[in-house]
């Protein structure tokens, strides 16, 4: 079940976020109708799958690796993320990192920039974590760009 994936959080019918899935869970993700996977974790992150691209593509899904350094998230990282989501606009997208912390921050910013009320986007972010100073500064910087 998708709910068994660490910090799984569906945002809409077309977008879900989570921590690192196992190889087996990528099969469940595909069976649930997801066609695109965006990975914001580093290859060295906790529980990272060394062959994740192959695992995802073997399930018939498109794979976008966008490794985001936990200590130094950048506007360029966010722009790549937004471009990947735009490329998959008509698809069901599963976005993950190690613990759904990077992802929840990126999705919060993305939703705010697309007109979702901040209170609604913040409620989903709070289900995962309260961003630390590094990440709150990143969020604030991207929102004013």
Model regions and ranges:
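Mobile, glycine- and charge-enriched loop segments
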Residues: 1-19, 25, 61, 140
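Bulky hydrophobic/aromatic packing residues
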Residues: 8, 32, 40, 70, ...
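Residue-level preference for short coil/turn positions at secondary-structure junctions
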Residues: 11, 33, 89-90
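Cysteine-based protein phosphatase catalytic domain of the PTP/DSP
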Residues: 16-86, 117
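Short SAM/SAH-binding signature in class I
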Residues: 36, 92-94
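PTP/DSP superfamily signal
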Residues: 77, 82-92, 99, 109-145
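Glycine-rich nucleophile elbow surrounding the catalytic serine of serine-hydrolase chemistry
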Residues: 101-105
């Amino acid at each position: 079940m998708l709910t068994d994936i660490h910090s799984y959080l569906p945002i809409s019918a077309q977008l879900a976020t989570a921590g690192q899935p196992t190889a087996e869970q990528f099969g469940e993700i595909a069976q649930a109708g997801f066609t695109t996977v965006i990975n914001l974790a580093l290859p060295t992150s906790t529980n990272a799958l060394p062959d994740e691209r192959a695992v995802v593509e073997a399930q018939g899904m498109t794979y976008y690796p966008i490794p985001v350094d936990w200590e130094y998230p950048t506007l360029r990282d966010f722009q790549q993320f937004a471009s990947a989501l735009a490329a998959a606009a008509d698809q069901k997208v599963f976005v993950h990192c190690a613990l759904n912390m990077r992802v929840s921050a990126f999705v919060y910013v993305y939703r705010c920039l697309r007109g979702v009320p901040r209170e609604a986007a913040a409620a989903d972010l709070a289900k995962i974590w309260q961003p630390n100073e590094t990440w709150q500064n990143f969020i604030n910087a991207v929102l004013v760009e």
